[in-house]
UniProtKB/Swiss-Prot annotation:
This is Protease HtpX homolog. One of its GO terms (molecular function) is metalloendopeptidase activity. The chain crosses the membrane at residues 7-24, 29-46, 145-165, 174-194. The keyword Ion transport does not apply. Belongs to the peptidase M48B family. Zn(2+) binds at residues 130, 134, 203. Its main location: membrane.
Length: 300
């Protein structure tokens, strides 16, 4: 059902984009808008992962410096039937994580130092499994495309506002001035709503598949509870500077709230935990992943 809903929302996003393009230049405007979107998506397809990792100051983890963490991620990737992603560390005390990359063969998982300090090895495994689920589902690519579409819609709407929309042969706007202005203001708003709805839908799906990958839904449920509580108290300075990337994290890094809202980047954490607990009660426990040895610190 999640995939059907995502497909419908993507169709709405595309229709909004073409509609704004048509408003600016009629049929030709819609075609030009489509070409612009293709160009923007092609650029982000190849560059978005490097850009977002740089925004958050992430640096690649040396397997020799963190063998336990590296082996855990590799074991989970093997269980998921996917290549081992690159592993990155973000120097912030807020516990959090995200995945990025255009496909499973070119993907990365970034975890914060705060995550490694605050969570147990089992909880870290649950978080990593969630991020691997995003990669396997190609959510990382999907969210890049939706973010690009939303940004392009806002750009086109601003262009239409300053330069005017298309007119008919008599020089009149078919929708009328009020209708044209309404579309220019409402289209970016609607695009943002659709983008966030897709993001929330994919989080639930990644929770479910991530729990299957690690074999213990309660590991992820426990991790979400801890991250939610700490994210409200600990700042993530780089995330605050780059709020457009908030939807990528496992929990909203911008002092996440506990309510489902139209513009919420994530579902209500309590609802996610409840779904995972229900999953744990109804499913047999899978075999354990390779055990992470007890650590004296985040890298030992």
């Amino acid at each position: 059902m999640g995939y059907v809903r995502t497909g419908i929302l993507m169709a709405v996003m595309t229709a909004l984009f073409l509609g704004v393009g048509a408003l600016i230049g009629g049929q030709s405007g819609a075609i030009i808008a489509l070409v612009i979107a293709a160009g923007m998506n092609l650029f982000t397809f190849w560059n978005s992962d490097r850009a977002v990792l740089s925004m958050h100051g992430a640096h690649e983890v040396d397997p020799r410096a963190a063998p336990d963490l590296y082996n855990m991620v590799r074991g989970l990737a093997d269980r998921a039937g996917m290549p081992m992603p690159k592993l990155y560390l973000i120097e912030t005390d807020q516990p959090n994580a995200f995945a990025t990359g255009r496909n499973p063969e070119n993907a990365a998982v970034a975890v914060t130092r705060g995550l490694l300090r605050a969570l147990t090895p089992e909880e870290v495994a649950g978080v990593v499994a969630h991020e691997l689920a995003h990669i396997r589902n190609r959510d990382t690519l999907l969210m890049t495309v939706t973010a690009t579409f939303a940004g392009a819609i806002s750009m086109l709407a601003n262009f239409a506002f300053f330069f005017g929309g298309s007119s008919n042969e008599e020089g009149e706007r078919p929708m009328g001035l009020v209708g044209t202005l309404a579309l220019m203001f409402l289209a970016p708003l609607a695009a943002g709503l659709v983008q966030m709805a897709i993001s929330r839908s994919r989080e639930y799906e990644a929770d479910r598949i991530g729990a299957e990958i690690c074999g213990r839904p309660l590991w992820l449920a426990s991790a979400l509870g801890k991250i939610e509580g700490l994210a409200q108290r600990i700042d993530n300075v780089r995330a605050e500077r780059n709020p457009a990337t908030a939807h990528m994290f496992i929990v909203n890094p911008l002092h996440a709230m506990g309510h489902d809202r139209l513009f919420a980047t994530h579902p209500n954490t309590a609802n996610r935990i409840a779904a995972l607990r229900a999953m744990a009660e109804g499913a047999p426990q899978a075999s354990r992943i390779p055990r992470v040895a007890a650590r004296r610190g985040p890298w030992s």
